[in-house]
């Protein structure tokens, strides 16, 4: 299933802290903006995948307007998309290298 959630990217001295206000406990951090985008997608996919597998309720995403009201000067909203069906397929089809010695 495809999901779209807003993440809050907060700039600090060491890089970025990323949180998803609609998903408690869905947090990550990164050194730069490129890594922040990658890490936010990764943590969102993992959070939603586990929630689906455990049949936990998944909160509906808040609107941009609603979330934008409470931002501070060092925070930015970024829309992140996650496709749990694709993640499951990617996990299932992961290749494994094995070394074998034949006599």
Annotate each predicted stretch with a short phrase.
Residues 21-24, 103:
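Short, proline-centered helix/strand-breaking motifs
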Residues 1-4, 45-101:
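Short, charged, surface-exposed hinge/linker loops at domain edges
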Residues 1-14, 19:
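N-terminal segment of the canonical double-stranded RNA-binding domain
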Residues 24-35, 99:
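A short, exposed loop/beta-hairpin motif centered on an aromatic-Gly-Thr core
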Residues 17, 28, 90:
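Short acidic, gly/pro-rich beta-turn/loop elements at beta-sheet edges
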Residues 32-49:
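A short, charged, amphipathic alpha-helix used as a generic interaction element across diverse proteins
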Residues 11, 22, 82-86:
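Non-catalytic surface loops within mature trypsin-like serine protease
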């Amino acid at each position: 299933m495809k999901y779209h959630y807003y993440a809050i990217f907060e700039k600090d001295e060491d890089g970025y802290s990323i949180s998803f206000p609609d998903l408690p406990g869905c947090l990550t951090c990164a050194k730069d903006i490129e890594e922040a985008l990658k890490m936010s997608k990764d943590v969102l996919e993992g959070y939603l995948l586990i929630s689906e597998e455990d049949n936990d309720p998944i909160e509906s995403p808040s609107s941009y307007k609603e979330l934008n009201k409470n931002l501070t000067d060092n925070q930015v909203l970024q829309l992140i998309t996650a496709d749990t069906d694709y993640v499951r397929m990617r996990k299932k089809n992961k290749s494994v290298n094995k070394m074998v010695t034949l006599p």
